Regions:
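Short, flexible loop/turn motifs enriched in small residues
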Residues: 11-16, 153-154, 166-169, 369-371
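ALDH superfamily catalytic-core signature
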Residues: 204, 229, 237-381
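N-terminal Rossmann-like NAD(P)+-binding subdomain of aldehyde/semialdehyde dehydrogenases
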Residues: 1-144, 314
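Short glycine-enriched loop/turn motifs at secondary-structure junctions
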Residues: 25-29, 226, 254-255, 288-291, ...
């Protein structure tokens, strides 16, 4: 059984306080995490400037090559993790056992993280609009148009309070290292595997350990991190996002409320897009902010909801080792029962119909965990509260709404796939400040182009553009 220790700028620290990580289905311990408190993090912040300093000593081109090597090690290598050596299969088994995700989904998320790291040169070229990365090192330089540009680093480290439930979100903090900004992470208690393995891969690839810190612990650690770091990110609920709204130091990531919109010019051919809808709702067991939670159309909505229910309603629980397993467990059974209670309340509202009611019980309870099978609801109006809901399992509402009202009614939407060729609808969505990622045409909401920014551009978050003038001394 592995013991994971805090990393104090690359150096393991053996804590006297350990927390067990248990198997979601058996309750058996699979690892121990040595917890620390916020006081240690606060004390160690005095070394944060060194994290950026050691990265600035390495040319960006070399950092990008080391990222490629780290990507290969992360996906294929045996790495020192905690007090043991972790193989790829060990990683997959451990992550599945503690998060409840089927093993094939863990493998898929692993490949996604590796892909982003291996293609970091292309991703940063896109996010910086082709800027020479040496300008970030020096702080200024020529952009190529005879214009001096300057970018001021806003923090020597990027802090991140990481989640328990979704290994895919780790792609968001990976660019910090090649941008010569250190990492200060609070790993999730149920999903410490990705940050620890990634840290090991980085260091094995030649990234200085002094640039990476890991502080497992309670809420005080997360709060200290967010208070002390000049730039940090946190993953949580809609309330978390609201709490940090307007705080320029914190990038808060929450529910996506991602949607598929049918234009009136396409909706009569809705059957052509059934597979797209199923994938958008069901991929990664519906756990991601990029999963579709709402399908909006002016007509055929009950037919669409019925077809989705017929596809997803029969999906049942399978063992996590099964390559056909489509549902992730709620490792906290009370969270599943609480979520199901909220869903039941939504389904009882006027104008709402449970389209999966005829496909058996949705809540599946086990001794140590629980599952929620897919739910498809039909809402005859965007005013139904269910039209604005998102849950951590395959759940979607099919909403009847006129095309002219859609853009004003959909609300906050991380990913919007618009199935239309109507120039007016496309222009309205393009101008909407409520839509982040916009897909025009048949692109599932869960398929991201990593050459595009996701929930903001990390380079703009870590670096501020400023004036920088130089004149020769007489």
């Amino acid at each position: 059984m592995l013991t994971l220790s805090a990393l104090r700028w690359g150096k393991p620290y053996k804590s006297l306080e350990a927390q067990e990580v248990v198997h979601f289905d058996t309750g058996e311990p699979i690892a121990k995490i040595g917890n620390v408190n916020g006081g240690m993090l606060q004390l160690d912040m005095k070394h944060a400037p060194r994290a950026r300093a050691v990265l600035r000593e390495i040319p960006p081109s070399d950092l990008l090559e080391r990222c490629k090597k780290a990507a290969d090690l992360f996906e294929n290598g045996d790495l020192p993790v905690g007090d043991g050596i972790q193989s790829v299969d060990d990683f997959i088994h451990q992550q599945s056992a503690s998060t409840g995700l089927p093993e094939h989904m863990c493998r898929s998320n692993m490949k996604k993280n590796s892909f982003v790291l291996a293609n970091m040169d292309k991703i940063l070229a896109a996010l910086t609009r082709g800027l020479d990365l040496n300008i970030f090192t020096r702080g200024h330089g020529e952009e190529g148009r005879g214009v001096t540009v300057s970018y001021q680093c806003q923090s020597p480290v990027l802090g991140a309070v990481l989640p328990n439930n979704s290994p895919g979100v780790h792609t968001l903090w990976l660019p910090a290292i090649p941008l010569q900004v250190g990492l200060l992470l609070k790993p999730g208690s149920q999903e410490p595997w990705t940050p620890y393995r990634m840290a090991a891969a980085f260091m094995a690839a030649g990234i200085p350990g002094e640039a990476i810190a890991m502080y497992p612990g309670g809420h005080d650690v997360g709060q200290t991190l967010l208070t002390r770091c000049q730039r940090s990110m946190i993953f949580g609920s809609a309330q978390t996002v609201e709490q940090y709204a307007g705080n320029p130091r914190v990038q808060a990531h929450g529910p996506g409320f991602s949607k598929i919109l049918f234009g009136d010019d396409v909706v009569d051919r809705w059957e052509d897009y059934l597979e797209l809808m199923v994938e958008s709702i069901f991929s990664n067991s519906g756990r991601s902010c990029i999963n579709c939670s709402g399908i909006w159309a002016s007509r055929h909505t009950e037919e669409i909801a019925k077809a989705l229910a017929e596809r997803l309603g029969p999906v049942d629980v399978l063992p996590p080792q099964d390559s056909n397993a489509g549902l992730a467990a709620f490792t906290n059974a009370k969270m599943a029962t609480g979520t199901w209670g909220m869903v039941q309340q939504d389904l009882q509202d006027s104008g709402v119909k449970d389209m999966t009611a005829g496909f058996g019980e949705r809540l599946v309870e086990r001794p140590y965990c629980a599952y929620l099978r897919p739910v498809i609801a039909h809402a005859n109006s965007p005013e139904c509260p269910v039209a604005a809901k998102e849950y951590m399992f395959p759940f979607a509402s099919v909403v009847k709404c006129s095309q002219k009202e859609m853009v004003n009614k959909i609300g906050s939407t991380l990913v919007c796939t618009a199935l239309t060729s109507d120039p007016q609808l496309i222009d309205a969505l393009t101008e909407s400040v409520h839509v982040d990622r916009l897909n025009i045409g048949p692109i599932p909401t869960n398929r991201l182009n990593w050459l595009q920014p996701h929930e903001g551009n990390l380079t703009d978050f870590l670096y501020r553009s400023r004036a920088y003038q130089i004149a020769a001394l007489g």
